[in-house]
Amino acid sequence: MNRRKVYSAPTSQLWHLFYYRYFRKHAKFEGDAEAISRAIVEKCWNGTFYCTSLGNFDYFWIRDFATVAKSLRQLGYVDKVRATITWALEQYMRRDAVTLCITPLGNLFDAPKRGIDTLPSLIHCIWTAKYKLNEHEKNFLERKLQEYVEDYINPATGMLLPKSDDAELRDGAIYDRSAYSVAMIERMAWACKHLGLKSFPYSHMIYRQELLLHYWNGDYFNADFNNTAFSAECALIPFIMRSVEDTEKLNKTLDYIRDQHIARPYAMRYTNTPKRFHYRLWARTVMRNYAGDTIWTWHGAYYLRLLWGQNRPEAAENEMAFASMIERYHTFPELLNPDGTLYNSLLYKSSEGMIWAAIYLTIDSYKPKS
């Protein structure tokens, strides 16, 4: 991989996490799950862009924003979504870099490391928001795509190079070409074609075929190229992003989640086999089990969407449990311990008021019409 400038998290962000862990209490919202979620989404708009949460992440995170851009658009916030993209592109172009995070003052950083999915997330959200790129923005993205290919892609095959140590959605775990990353690159390839971006020359179909031929194990998409374990984002994102459109495989995955009780007590745990993964040092020490079998509401909201999209018999029960969790904590929390209590560790506690609440608010649109 070519050497790129490192954009480390500023010390102020680390202090913010420490302060939030020991000295700040969660804000609480009144009302039912829908009212709480709607209030959170409203407050995550800071007048300039959508921040990621009302707690630890009061800044811009492209990965999270990309996953809620469609939901925010469905909720009627299309102008704010596009304003967020404009602002983010301005900050990126000013520094000639694309990072996972941007502070409200426009400072770029990656947390915990540079992300394999950073550029795919940016390009995906541009496409899903129907954002009109100007020539300056297009030229910038063409350069970043060239760098991405140099850093991550085997030019002969178009596939991800093996064993990158860079981060991705489940950033406490270390992957070797995760199914999630392959799905995000498939979406980037699709979006590039439709946005008229020429510097990523590979067809989205080769990544779809890779998922089907190498990652699908009969029950779900394997976590990565060599690890056959279940990981929520790797199992769900290929269907959520429509990298794979196969209802039989989707229902096989939903069967597995049901049978293995992965969505209990709330949707849903990262994995049912946490010992089958390698974790970064901080995820084994000061933030133990952060990316193990903890419950992540991000994937939980996606899970509900997929359940209702297939009109599954367990959909209503899971939605009721999820709503009770939101009402129990009077917020949309980031993650919970396996027993359903709020996650706390030596350095870190679960954030509050996650922008992911936007996904939850659009679940009704996936329910069968009566």
Regions found by a protein language model. Give the residues of each.
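Low-complexity, Ser/Thr/Pro/Gly-enriched N-terminal "stalk/linker" regions
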Residues: 1-60, 82-83, 87, 96
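Solvent-exposed loop and edge beta-strand segments that line ligand/cofactor-binding
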Residues: 2-16, 47-66, 73, 103-120, ...
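Well-ordered alpha-helical scaffold segments within catalytic/enzyme domains
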Residues: 6, 10-26, 66-78, 120-136, ...
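Active-site acid/base region of carbohydrate-active enzymes
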Residues: 16-36, 75, 93, 126-180, ...
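Extended, well-ordered alpha-helical scaffold segments
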Residues: 29-36, 76-91, 133-151, 194-217, ...
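Catalytic cores of carbohydrate-active enzymes
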Residues: 57, 95-101, 156-167, 174-275, ...
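Aromatic-rich carbohydrate-recognition surfaces in CAZymes
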Residues: 58-156, 182, 294-304, 320, ...
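C-terminal hydrophobic structural anchor segments
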Residues: 293-333
